[in-house]
A protein has these predicted regions:
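Structured, hydrophobic secondary-structure cores that serve as assembly/anchoring elements
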Residues: 1-218
C-alpha cells in the first residue's frame, strides 16, 4: 500500500478572522470544515475510488462480484442474487444510494409483501434487509448505476492511515495581502485484502465479501 496525500487549502482576510462570531480555526477543524470534507472524501474513495492516486474502492476492486440487475431499479430478486454471491460467513452491511430511499421502502416481493425493509422495534436498531443492516448514503452512485446497491463486509477491506488529518494556519503565507491561510493534509490508502473473488470447494462457484448490483443484463 502507498499512502495517497489529500490536501485542502483556503484563505480568509484578517478582518474576517477578527470579526467572525465563531472561531474560523475551530470551524475549519470540525465536521463542517476542511477536516469533515476530507473525512467525506475518504469514505467516498473507499466505495468509488479508482486506485489511481487514491484508495481502491470496492466498486472497482478485482475481488468484487457484480450481479447483473433484472430491470432498471433494484428488485427483490436482485437483492436475493446478491446475497447468494456474498461470502456465507461474512458480516455484511448494505450500502444503498440515498437516491433509492423511497424505492427501497416500497419494494414488494413476488408474494406481494408490502415491504422488505423496516426498522426494528427496539430503539436505536438499524433498518434490516434480508438479515443485514442497511446504511443509506450519498457516497454510493446515483440510482440505476452500477454500485447503487452494495453488500460488503468491511473486515476484508484494508485501510492504511499514515497521517491523521491536520489543519494548520499561518499569517505569513499571504502576509502582504493581510490574509490568513489554512492547510489541511491527510495521507491514507485503502483496498480489499483480496485481489479476486473466493471459490467454493467445487472450484467454480465464486463468492466474495464485496458484492455490488451491476448493469442490466442484456
Amino acid at each position: 500500500m502507498v499512502a495517497h496525500k489529500l490536501i485542502g487549502y483556503t484563505t480568509a482576510s484578517d478582518e474576517l478572522v477578527a470579526d467572525s462570531a465563531i472561531s474560523l480555526a475551530d470551524f475549519l477543524s470540525g465536521p463542517l470544515g476542511m477536516a469533515g470534507g476530507i473525512a467525506w472524501m475518504e469514505d467516498y474513495a473507499f466505495i468509488q475510488g479508482t486506485g489511481a492516486g487514491q484508495p481502491l474502492g470496492v466498486i472497482n476492486a478485482g475481488a468484487t462480484i457484480s450481479v447483473a440487475r433484472v430491470g432498471t431499479d433494484p428488485t427483490y430478486p436482485d437483492l436475493c442474487n446478491m446475497v447468494e454471491n456474498f461470502l456465507p460467513s461474512g458480516r455484511g452491511v448494505w450500502f444503498i444510494s440515498q437516491s433509492l430511499y423511497s424505492e427501497m421502502l416500497q419494494m414488494s416481493g413476488p408474494t406481494g409483501n408490502a415491504s422488505y425493509l423496516w426498522g426494528n422495534a427496539q430503539s436505536g436498531a438499524p433498518n434490516m434487509l434480508l438479515g443485514f443492516p442497511v446504511v443509506f448514503t450519498e457516497k454510493c452512485p446515483l440510482r440505476n448505476n452500477p454500485g447503487d446497491v452494495i453488500l460488503a463486509d468491511w473486515r476484508y477491506y484494508l485501510i492504511g492511515d499514515r497521517q491523521a488529518t491536520t489543519v494548520e494556519s499561518t499569517q505569513f503565507d499571504l502576509w502582504r495581502y493581510d490574509k490568513t491561510s489554512w492547510r489541511a493534509v491527510h495521507r491514507v490508502d485503502g483496498q480489499p485484502w483480496l485481489s479476486q473473488p473466493l471459490y467454493y470447494q467445487d472450484g467454480t462457484t465464486q463468492i466474495s465479501p464485496f458484492v455490488i448490483l451491476g448493469s442490466k443484463s442484456s
